[in-house]
Amino acid sequence: MQRALNSITRFALIPVGIWGMVACGYHFQTAGVIPAGLEPIFIEVFENRTNQAGLETTVTNAVVFEFVKRNEAALARNAADASVVMKGVIRSVELQTISTRGRDVAGERQVTMRIDVQLVAPDGKVKWAAKNLSGQEAYPVSNDKFLNDDRQRVALGTVSTRIAERVYDRLIDNF
């Protein structure tokens, strides 16, 4: 009897769990449909206008990975084979202390990155653009400068991933 009751309870909870996910707006990422005429896309290395060396590689890799993960067929291997080229500019990286550990000693910092992205056709016309996309991530600060630099680099990687997701979502949602 107890075993039957446990099975009934388990099966009753499945629809409740599904309903809870749907009701709260949770949804899985989908590949989505990239508008006609914009495939395949070649992703150029982003321009880095910040003082963060190597950030252009981190951001570009995050965007490429997002496209590979969700719709690898949308990518061209080189610019000559592409319908459009994705060009991006990393506009800024800002650091802000968001908590302290005593007088004038940072306890936690937040890094904010802003980028612009556009899809450009071979004739130079901009087919799509997203300006001022931003993301932020907090990280703990210690007395060790090397550890702080590493934590900042990891935070910038996290922000790059979030912005890459936003770029893809914006592309499939804007049309």
Where are these regions (language model features)?
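Compositionally biased, intrinsically disordered linkers/stalks adjacent to structured regions
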Residues: 149-175
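A structural "domain/chain start" motif
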Residues: 22-65, 69-80, 95, 143, ...
